[in-house]
Amino acid sequence: MAKKNERIVETRLGRLTLPEERVLQFPRGLIGFGDQREFTLIQVREDSPFLVLQSLDNPSLGLLVADPYSFMTEYEVVIGEADRRLLGIDSREQATVLVTVTIPQGMPERTTLNLSGPIVVNNEARVGLQIPQTDSRYPAHYTPGMATPKKS
């Protein structure tokens, strides 16, 4: 049974007991999932760079995500003033940046990161936004290890 400040959440990874402080609010939802507003991050394995951004309302909705800086150093996320206000941050350094990951079944060598739609989370306020990027250097299907064009 869940304690007062805990939730029991069904996921594809099994049932989890989740403290309220692990709940992330996404006021605009995510692209394609605008009605999903509450998520949590679940570590896939201790030695893995991957997490699951799990919807708390839909057990079948869990997106594989990762810190893009684990795969590349040159990645500049632009966060507009309105988004910074909604997140409650003054600069990008106050937030965690994540990108969705696609690993085709049986073909891990074809893994791609979506650099054009990063997910930015203020861990302290527990608020997240998906913030589409307009910089064409950052594709929706970036293969880790592939060179990214430098800013001109």
From Swiss-Prot:
InterPro entries: Flagellar_assembly_factor_FliW, Flagellar_assmbl_FliW_dom_sf
Record carries keyword Lyase: no
GO cellular component terms listed in the entry, alphabetical order: cytoplasm
Example GO BP: bacterial-type flagellum assembly
Predominant location: cytoplasm
Domain of life: Bacteria
Coiled-coil regions listed: none
Keyword Methyltransferase attributed: no
UniProt subcellular location: Cytoplasm
Gene3D superfamilies tied to this protein: BH3618-like
Pfam families: FliW
Keyword annotations from UniProtKB, A to Z: Bacterial flagellum biogenesis, Chaperone, Cytoplasm, Translation regulation
Family statement: Belongs to the FliW family.
Job description of the protein: Acts as an anti-CsrA protein, binds CsrA and prevents it from repressing translation of its target genes, one of which is flagellin. Binds to flagellin and participates in the assembly of the flagellum.
Annotated NCBIfam families: PRK13285.1-1
Oligomeric form and interacting partners: Interacts with translational regulator CsrA and flagellin(s).
Protein name: Flagellar assembly factor FliW
